[in-house]
Amino acid sequence: MYYLQMSGYGYRKRICEGVTDWFMNRYMPRHIIDLRVVHRGLKRDLVYGWCDFEDNYKRPRAFLIELQSNMSLELYIKTLIHELVHVRQWVFGSLRQKRGKMYYGSTNVEDLDYDDQPHEIEAREQEETLYITYLIETGQMFPRKNRPRHLL
């Protein structure tokens, strides 16, 4: 079960709700999670999205996801999925904070370049696969009449 609060400008409410609902019910159905998704200008930060926890760093259950406003639909969905992968990493404990430093497994990721951080590599690898899975499972990739038989 999760709680979702959205705010900001330049986003599609139904898409945000739909992607989040699909991801949370598929990958974390038994966890009680509080999600706050804020849409705002992030261009100065040179990012499309951020994910951070808002409560206890040992077992975080409240998260803030910030997303760039006015993205294309595909980029928006992929970015939201990417940040939700980080939520899953925090919840399952593969990403954690210890003594003020962030770790992925036993690797201190703060000394690594962003592109080399293992939790980012995992999220980037999964975002494309999960994006396609989302489109297929929600019927957006293939309209019902054109869907391959094994997907009906």
Please tell me what each predicted stretch does.
Residues 113-116, 127-152:
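Long, well-structured alpha-helical subdomains associated
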Residues 26-32, 94-96, 134-142:
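Surface-exposed helix-capping loop/turn segments at secondary-structure junctions
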Residues 1-11, 33-46:
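Hydrophobic or amphipathic, alpha-helical segments that drive membrane association/targeting
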Residues 78-91, 123:
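Active-site recognition of the HExxH zinc-binding catalytic motif
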Residues 74, 90-121:
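Post-HEXXH active-site segment of zinc metalloproteases
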Residues 40-75, 90-91:
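Active-site scaffold of zinc-dependent metalloenzymes
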Residues 11-32:
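Zn2+-dependent metallopeptidase catalytic core
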